């Protein structure tokens, strides 16, 4: 599950004892979901929210419920409500990045991931997802290149070279995030392999060798 659950949400207010109501209601709703009684689960959350409409934890409990029953549009709507009430919580922006990315809204997803990093630059999953999002653009470029690779027409060769530049630019865009991810999580094999392949493609042999060494050390 790529989403961060509401239990990971931390309310930054101090000097107040947090109500246990959101967690209790969430557990009741979960029991209903496990029994296949989704309508009762939704009703339980909505009843609690009617009493405390501004409680961010209740909003997140409702969002968790909708992701469990597969309603991603409602999840996104609730996460946006949560962001409006707590605009400095990085996890909320991260979740919005995930859901928008899954729905093909890559530009919007990227904006949410960047906002999440602005608020919390230490969360490795945000970097990983952002790199993956940027590299989504590689597929269409490679597909076009493959159609031109055997052509000897000057115009096609020129198009191929332009596409190759676009591909390199894509790699250059994601490298800072990938390098930061490796700095935060140096044992992330997926990140190391991706960096290794990118360095090889852009002819950065020194860093290619460095990634190779790191991978060999981890695999041994």
Task: Place the predicted regions along the sequence by residue.
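Canonical positions in the second alpha-helix
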Residues: 48, 81-82, 115-116, 181, ...
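Short coil/linker segments at helix-helix boundaries
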Residues: 2-22, 136-177
